């Protein structure tokens, strides 16, 4: 994934120093796009190890509509624990907005599947996670926001849109805030997996994943890790096999996915900014 390394290098060389909500500070650019042909391999970063179970379980959790971390923790995925209440609640985050937007019974995922099957040329096949009604206040903690009925965190990956051409399904992800080192490789993998799943449900081939970022940043405490990653040579991409076609987009299980030939460099540890 040379495209991703070029992205890191561009931020490192062109980013401006900015303060941020977490107090860590960033090197930041505004506006960047990467394109990945899903026919040429699954875009899983190889210059460090990506924890595949976290990618898969989080996506299945989103699709379930759940906003409690119990399912994740039961599967040894703890990427959301920092922001949850003692009861494991995160408020109306991604899953809630995807499956029941604003609590109004609007199942955006079911709607896009239906549109792809019946009107694939529509320009309205998109899903919003950004809901201004529940954006949390920066003046109080994530947990306090949840108590007030807001989400613990605002969605970083705010919108995605599907597009069909030549019987191929492409997805464009719009990410308002992009943690280039920790978050973006994970997001690319997650939405690539989702595109494969939706394509299978709609009897389509996969096309491209287009990743578009707004505020793209490297945290100041990730510079050393970025330099380490940039020193590594990318390896061949793995391939994804979906072992069965489930009855619906909501019925897939972790065991349905197999990532073949995922060869990678060692993991690079970095602290997440809370």
From Swiss-Prot:
Transferase in keyword set: yes
Binding site residues for dUMP: 21, 123-124, 176-179, 187, 217-219
Subcellular location field: Cytoplasm
Keyword Isomerase set for record: no
GO CC field: cytosol
Keyword line: Cytoplasm, Methyltransferase, Nucleotide biosynthesis, Transferase
GO biological process: dTMP biosynthetic process; dTTP biosynthetic process; methylation
Residues noted as binding (6R)-5,10-methylene-5,6,7,8-tetrahydrofolate in the record, renumbered to the chain: 51, 179, 273
Biochemical pathway: Pyrimidine metabolism; dTTP biosynthesis
Active site positions: 156 (nucleophile)
The EC number(s) this enzyme carries: 2.1.1.45
InterPro entries membership: Thymidate_synth/dCMP_Mease, Thymidate_synth/dCMP_Mease_dom, Thymidate_synth/dCMP_Mease_sf, Thymidylate_synthase
Source species, domain of life: Bacteria
Catalytic activity: dUMP + (6R)-5,10-methylene-5,6,7,8-tetrahydrofolate = 7,8-dihydrofolate + dTMP
GO MF, any single term: thymidylate synthase activity
Pfam families: Thymidylat_synt
Function: Catalyzes the reductive methylation of 2'-deoxyuridine-5'-monophosphate (dUMP) to 2'-deoxythymidine-5'-monophosphate (dTMP) while utilizing 5,10-methylenetetrahydrofolate (mTHF) as the methyl donor and reductant in the reaction, yielding dihydrofolate (DHF) as a by-product. This enzymatic reaction provides an intracellular de novo source of dTMP, an essential precursor for DNA biosynthesis.
UniProt subunit comment: Homodimer.
Stored PANTHER family: THYMIDYLATE SYNTHASE 1
Family in the record: Belongs to the thymidylate synthase family. Bacterial-type ThyA subfamily.
Protein name in UniProt: Thymidylate synthase
Organism of this sequence: Francisella tularensis subsp. holarctica (strain LVS)
């Amino acid at each position: 994934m040379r495209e991703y390394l070029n992205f890191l290098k561009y931020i490192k060389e062109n980013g401006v120093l900015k303060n941020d909500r977490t107090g860590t500070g960033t090197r930041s650019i505004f506006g960047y796009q990467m394109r990945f042909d899903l026919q040429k391999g699954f875009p899983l970063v190889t210059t460090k190890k990506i924890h595949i179970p976290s990618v898969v379980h989080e996506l299945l959790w989103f699709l379930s509509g759940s906003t409690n971390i119990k399912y994740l923790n039961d599967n040894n995925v703890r990427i959301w624990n920092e922001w949850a209440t003692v009861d494991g609640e995160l408020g109306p985050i991604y899953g809630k907005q995807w499956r029941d937007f604003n609590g109004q019974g609007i199942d955006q995922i079911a709607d896009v599947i239906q549109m792809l099957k019946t009107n694939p040329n529509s320009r309205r096949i998109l899903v919003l996670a950004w809901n201004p009604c529940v954006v949390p206040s920066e003046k109080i903690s994530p947990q306090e926001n949840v108590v007030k009925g807001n989400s613990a965190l605002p969605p970083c990956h705010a919108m995605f849109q599907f597009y069909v051409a030549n019987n191929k399904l492409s997805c464009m992800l719009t990410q308002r805030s992009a943690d280039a080192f920790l978050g973006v490789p994970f997001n690319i993998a997650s939405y690539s997996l989702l595109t494969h799943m939706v394509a299978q449900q709609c009897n389509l081939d996969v096309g491209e994943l287009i990743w578009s970022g707004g505020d793209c940043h490297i945290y100041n405490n990730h510079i050393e890790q970025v330099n380490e990653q940039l020193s590594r040579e990318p390896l061949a991409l793995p391939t994804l096999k979906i072992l069965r076609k489930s009855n619906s987009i909501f019925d897939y299980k972790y065991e349905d996915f197999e990532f073949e030939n995922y060869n990678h460099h060692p993991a690079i540890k970095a602290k997440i900014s809370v």
